[in-house]
Amino acid sequence: DLIDIAQYGAPGRELGLPPADYKLSWRCENGRGVYTFCMCPGGKVVVASSQAGGVVTNGMSYHDRASGTANSALLCDVRTSDFGSEDVLAGVAFQEKLEHQAFLAGGSSYAPPRCTWGELRDGKAPQVESCLPDFAIAAMREAMPHLGRKLHGFDAPDAMMTAVETRSSSPVRFVRNAEYEGAC
């Protein structure tokens, strides 16, 4: 009901409306963007790993979207300069590194690391912090209060955070020329 009340002013079912959704974004002082992605009313976060020794999460909703919970990925811009290499597959290596760190932080059991927003905000979430780059943690800490002003309750201290969502966009960039053709 938190999202419905923030968006509609009352639970959607009382108003004859579907579960509310949202899209939030914030541009940090350093220019890095933080945004929600793939909001799932009535959803939950599941492990969607495709490789041994890695944890990646994804959100999902059941058909009726009536579980009483909601989720979305909270993402921040990742730049090619963050990869630490100019290799064409550096983004893939970066993604795999984060997924392996999440696997280790979850006890090597394919359980994703979790914490509350309050714990991450206050630097008391070592499992989650160990599998996120410092720039991502800093960006989330800067953005969350602003996102909470856009959607009341989004930054509640008890909001759950689950790591990591690394598959929202391709880790490989194809360089193109002025005619949008692949460069060789």
Task: Explain the meaning of each model-derived region.
Residues 1-184:
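Residues forming the flavin
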